C-alpha cells in the first residue's frame, strides 16, 4: 500500500510511455547519425546543456501541480543571475584569489536564492491573496522581474567574474558534470518533497480540487505561497547555472527556455489542471527533449524551425493526454451527476 | 395499452439507460396524455432525472422506444424535443438575470423564428400574451434578477408557453415556494391543463402537487415500482413506494440532563444572508436547521465553519471565542463541516480513498522535516473507513469509483478522524441510496451518544425528525421557529416551514 495517488501498474503509467519515447528518440537519433550523436563529446555536451532548462521545468512542475503555472521563471532566473553577477563583479572582480572569491560566490548564490524566494513570494501573494489567475499574474510579474534586471544592467551583459564562478557550470566531479549533479539533487529533493511530505500531499490535493481543500481546512494560502517560493528558488538556481556557463549575466538570456520548460512539464505527464505530476516523468521528458534538440542541431535545423517544432509538440502532447486521461479532467471541470 | 398510446403526447416503452455499467433506468414505460399532470416521484438516484433527460433529448437511451406527439422519435436531441413542444424548467430556472422579463420570455421564440433582426415590440407582445395566459401581472421591463423566486418561476413558465409548449416538465417546483405561492402555482397549472398543456412534476416532495395531478409514477433504483391515479396516493404511501420500506426510524434518545453547552452562537449576522442568529448546542445534542431554498440555511452553515465571514456576532466553542471567517480556526476549535455538494466541495475525486480521509490528519502524522509517517497514517484512515463500513475493495482506488453513500462516509471519516467537538452536516444524505441514508442517520445518533454536538442542515423533513432533538426553522435569513424534534409531525413542520 502506498500514498502514491492514482494506482496503476508501471507499464500502464504515463511515465512508462515516456521511458519508451525517450529511448525511441535516442535510438532514432543514434541511427540517423551514429558517429556524431553517440560520440563521447556529444553526450558530454548534452549533459552540460540540459540541466539549466531542466531546473526551470522543475519549477514549472510544482506550480502546475496546483493547477497554476509560473511564466516568470526566466525573468526570475535572469534577475537572480544579474544580482549575483553584480555582486561578483563589483565586490569580487576577475583578479580575486580563489579563497576569498569562494566566500563572495557563496554570498552571491545566497543573494540570488533570496531574490528567487522574494519573487516567488510576490507571485504566490498575487495568486493566493488577490486571487489572480496564475497565468496572468506570473506573465505580468515576469515582465517586471525582467524590467528590473534591465534597469540594473542597462540591458548589457554583466561579466568579469572570479575564475571560481565558472566551476558551477563547466567542471565535472568524478566525471559527472556539476550542473547535472545539481539538477539530480534538486530533482530528487522535489520528488521527496512531493511524495513523502505532508506539504507534497497538500499540493497534490489542492491541485485535484482547490475547493475541497478549502473545505477540508487545508491552509491553502500557505500552500500556494510555499509552492511559488519554491518555484522562484528553483528558477534562481537555474539562473546561476546559466550565469556560470555563459560566464556572464544578462536580462534576456534563455528566453526560449520558457516554452521549453512548459513543454517538458506537460510532456512529463504533469496535469496542467493540477493534481497529478511525477518528477521521474519530468526527468524522462527532459532527456527526450535534449536528445531531440541535439539531433535537430546535428541535422542543422534552424533555430526558428526548432521553436515551431516545440510549439507543435506541446499542443500535440496535450491533445494526446486529453484523450488518454481526458475523462478525469472533464469530470472535474463539470461534475456529471447521474441520477 | 396501445389505444392509450395512440393519443398520448409522450409514450415511452421499455426505456433502459445504462451509464458505464450502471443501470440508471430499467425497462420503464411512461405515458403522458395531453392536458394531464403527472407526478414523477423518486428519491435521489432513482432515475427520475435520467428519464427527464431522455424525454428532453439530452441523453440517448440504451434500449426502448420513444413517441412524442404521436410520432416515433428514433433520433432525439434537445432541439427536436423542444420543437415537439417539450419544455423543461430546471430548479434554477436557467433565466438570464441581467435581462428584462419580456426579453427572457421572448428570447427563445425569437431565436427559433430565425429572423436576423431583433423586434422589441414583437417581443413585448409575445411576453404579454404569455403572462395573460397564466393570468399573472409582472412588470415587463423589470430585470429578472430583482424578482422574487416565485416570480422567476412564473417567468420561466411563460417562456415555455411562448415557445408553444405542449408539455412542461418542472424540476422540484415547490422547494423554494411558500404555501401561498404554491397555491398560486397550482391555480396556474389548472389553467394550463384546461389549455391542453401537460405537466410533469419531478420531485421527492410531492404532497403539495398531488391535488392537481391525475397520475403518479414512482421510480426506485431505475424501475417503475408504482403507477396509479393521484387520488390513490398520500404522503405515506408515496414515501413507502419511494423508499421501499415502512420506515418510522427510531427517533433519537433524549439528551442526557445536565449536558454542558458545547457551542454558543450570538447575534451572528451577514448582510443579505442571515441575521440575529442565536443558539446554543449541548454536548450530545443533534440540532436540526431547516428552511426553504434561499432561507439562508447554507450561508449560516458555511459561516459556522468560517467559509463565509459574518458581519458581526460571535461563535464560541467550549466557552472560547472562535475567529469567524476562517475555516482553519474553526477546524482547530473542533468544528467539522461536511459540505452540501460532495462532488465539488467534499471530495478530491481523482485521488485515492485513503488520501481523501488522510488529508484531515496530515499535521498529526508529519514527523521531522514534514516527512509523513505513511504507514501510521494509512492505518488510521483505513481504521476509520472500516468503522464507518465504507464498502471499498481497494482503498487506493480513486474515490470517484465509490457510490454516493460510500463517498459521503469517506467525507465523514475524514472529519471523525479529527475527533471534532461539533460536527456540521449540510444535507447529509443528498444523493445517497435509501440504505445508506438510514446508516448515516444511525451514525449521527452514535456520534451524539458519544457526546459530540451535531448540527444537521437539511430540507428533508423526515430526516430531521429522525435525527434531531431540536429543530430551528429559518425564513428570510432569520430563525422564525424552534421546535422539539419529538413534538411535531412532518405535516406540522412543513407548514411552519412554508407558511
Describe the predicted segments one by one.
Chain A
Residues 104-112, 118-123, 175-249:
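Helix-loop-helix "hairpin" substructures at the membrane interface of multi-pass membrane proteins
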Residues 130, 134-196, 223-226, 245-254, ...:
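Transmembrane helix-bundle core of multi-pass membrane transporters
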Residues 35-45, 92, 150, 156, ...:
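Inter-helical junctions in multi-pass inner-membrane proteins, predominant
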Residues 235, 246-311:
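Transmembrane alpha-helical segments in multi-pass inner-membrane proteins
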Amino acid at each position: 500500500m502506498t500514498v502514491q495517488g492514482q494506482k496503476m501498474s508501471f507499464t500502464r503509467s504515463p511515465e512508462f510511455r515516456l521511458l519508451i519515447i525517450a529511448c525511441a528518440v535516442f535510438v532514432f537519433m543514434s541511427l540517423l547519425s551514429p558517429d556524431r550523436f553517440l560520440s563521447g563529446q556529444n553526450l558530454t555536451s548534452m549533459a552540460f546543456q540540459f540541466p539549466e532548462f531542466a531546473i526551470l521545468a522543475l519549477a514549472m512542475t510544482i506550480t502546475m501541480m496546483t493547477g497554476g503555472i509560473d511564466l516568470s521563471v526566466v525573468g526570475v532566473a535572469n534577475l537572480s543571475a544579474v544580482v549575483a553577477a553584480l555582486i561578483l563583479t563589483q565586490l569580487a572582480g576577475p583578479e580575486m584569489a580563489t579563497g576569498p572569491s569562494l566566500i563572495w560566490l557563496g554570498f552571491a548564490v545566497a543573494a540570488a536564492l533570496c531574490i528567487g524566494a522574494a519573487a516567488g513570494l510576490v507571485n504566490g501573494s498575487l495568486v493566493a491573496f488577490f486571487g489572480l489567475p496564475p497565468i496572468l499574474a506570473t506573465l505580468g510579474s515576469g515582465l517586471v522581474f525582467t524590467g528590473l534586471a534591465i534597469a540594473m544592467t542597462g540591458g548589457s551583459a554583466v561579466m568579469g567574474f572570479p575564475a571560481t564562478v565558472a566551476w558551477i557550470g563547466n567542471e565535472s566531479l568524478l566525471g559527472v558534470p556539476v550542473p547535472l549533479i545539481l539538477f539530480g539533487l534538486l530533482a530528487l529533493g522535489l520528488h521527496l518533497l512531493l511524495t513523502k511530505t505532508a506539504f507534497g500531499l497538500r499540493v497534490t490535493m489542492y491541485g485535484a480540487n482547490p475547493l475541497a481543500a478549502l473545505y477540508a481546512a487545508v491552509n491553502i494560502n500557505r500552500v500556494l505561497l510555499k509552492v511559488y517560493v519554491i518555484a522562484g528558488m528553483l528558477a534562481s538556481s537555474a539562473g546561476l547555472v546559466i550565469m556560470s556557463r555563459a560566464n556572464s549575466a544578462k536580462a534576456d538570456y534563455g528566453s526560449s527556455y520558457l516554452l521549453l520548460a512548459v513543454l517538458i512539464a506537460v510532456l512529463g505527464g504533469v496535469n496542467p489542471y493540477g493534481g497529478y505530476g511525477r518528477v521521474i516523468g519530468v526527468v524522462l521528458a527532459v532527456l527526450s527533449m535534449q536528445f531531440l534538440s541535439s539531433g535537430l542541431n546535428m541535422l542543422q535545423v534552424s533555430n526558428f524551425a526548432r521553436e515551431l517544432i516545440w510549439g507543435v509538440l506541446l499542443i500535440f502532447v496535450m491533445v494526446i493526454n486529453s484523450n488518454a486521461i481526458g475523462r478525469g479532467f472533464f469530470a472535474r471541470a463539470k461534475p456529471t451527476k447521474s441520477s | 395499452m396501445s389505444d392509450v398510446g395512440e393519443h398520448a403526447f409522450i409514450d415511452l416503452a421499455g426505456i433502459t439507460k445504462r451509464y458505464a455499467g450502471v443501470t440508471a433506468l430499467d425497462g420503464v414505460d411512461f405515458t403522458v396524455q395531453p392536458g394531464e399532470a403527472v407526478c414523477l416521484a423518486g428519491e435521489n438516484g432513482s432515475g427520475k432525472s435520467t428519464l427527464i433527460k431522455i424525454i428532453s433529448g439530452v441523453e440517448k437511451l440504451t434500449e426502448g422506444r420513444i413517441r412524442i406527439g404521436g410520432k416515433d422519435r428514433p433520433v432525439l436531441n434537445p432541439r427536436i424535443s423542444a420543437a415537439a413542444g417539450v419544455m423543461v424548467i430546471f430548479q434554477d430556472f436557467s433565466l438570464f438575470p441581467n435581462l428584462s422579463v419580456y426579453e427572457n420570455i421572448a428570447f427563445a421564440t425569437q431565436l427559433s423564428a430565425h429572423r436576423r433582426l431583433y423586434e422589441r415590440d414583437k417581443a413585448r407582445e409575445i411576453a404579454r400574451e404569455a403572462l395573460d395566459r397564466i393570468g399573472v401581472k409582472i412588470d415587463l421591463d423589470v430585470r429578472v434578477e430583482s424578482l422574487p423566486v416565485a416570480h422567476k418561476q412564473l417567468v420561466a413558465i411563460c417562456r415555455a408557453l411562448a415557445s408553444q409548449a405542449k408539455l412542461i416538465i418542472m424540476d422540484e417546483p415547490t422547494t423554494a415556494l411558500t404555501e401561498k405561492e404554491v397555491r398560486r402555482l397550482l391555480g396556474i397549472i389548472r389553467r394550463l391543463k384546461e389549455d391542453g398543456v401537460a405537466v410533469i412534476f419531478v420531485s421527492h416532495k410531492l404532497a403539495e402537487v398531488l391535488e392537481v395531478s391525475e397520475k403518479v409514477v414512482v421510480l426506485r433504483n431505475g424501475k417503475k415500482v408504482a403507477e396509479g391515479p393521484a387520488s390513490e396516493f398520500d404522503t405515506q404511501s408515496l414515501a413507502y413506494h419511494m423508499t421501499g420500506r415502512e420506515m418510522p426510524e427510531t427517533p433519537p434518545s433524549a439528551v442526557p440532563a445536565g449536558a454542558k453547552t458545547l457551542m454558543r452562537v450570538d447575534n451572528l449576522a451577514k448582510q443579505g444572508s442571515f441575521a440575529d442568529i442565536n443558539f446554543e448546542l449541548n454536548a450530545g445534542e443533534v440540532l436540526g436547521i431547516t428552511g426553504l431554498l434561499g432561507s439562508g440555511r447554507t450561508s449560516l452553515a458555511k459561516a459556522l465553519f468560517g467559509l463565509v465571514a459574518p458581519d458581526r456576532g460571535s461563535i464560541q466553542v467550549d466557552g472560547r471565542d472562535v475567529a469567524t471567517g476562517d475555516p482553519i480556526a474553526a477546524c482547530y476549535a473542533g468544528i467539522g463541516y461536511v459540505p452540501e455538494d460532495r462532488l465539488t466541495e467534499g471530495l478530491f475525486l481523482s485521488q485515492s480513498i485513503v488520501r481523501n480521509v488522510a488529508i484531515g490528519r496530515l499535521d498529526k502524522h508529519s514527523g521531522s522535516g514534514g516527512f509523513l509517517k505513511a504507514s501510521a497514517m494509512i492505518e488510521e484512515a483505513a481504521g476509520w473507513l472500516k468503522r464507518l463500513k465504507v464498502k471499498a475493495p481497494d482503498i487506493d482506488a480513486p474515490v470517484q469509483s465509490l457510490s454516493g453513500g460510500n463517498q459521503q462516509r469517506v467525507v465523514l471519516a475524514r472529519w471523525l478522524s479529527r475527533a471534532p467537538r461539533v460536527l456540521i452536516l449540510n444535507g447529509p444524505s443528498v444523493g445517497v441510496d435509501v440504505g445508506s441514508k438510514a446508516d448515516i442517520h444511525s451514525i449521527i445518533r452514535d456520534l451524539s451518544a458519544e457526546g459530540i454536538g451535531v448540527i444537521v442542515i437539511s430540507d428533508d423533513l423526515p430526516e430531521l425528525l429522525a435525527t434531531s432533538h431540536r429543530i430551528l426553522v429559518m425564513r428570510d435569513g432569520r430563525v422564525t421557529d424552534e421546535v422539539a424534534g419529538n413534538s411535531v409531525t412532518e405535516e406540522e413542520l412543513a407548514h411552519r416551514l412554508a407558511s
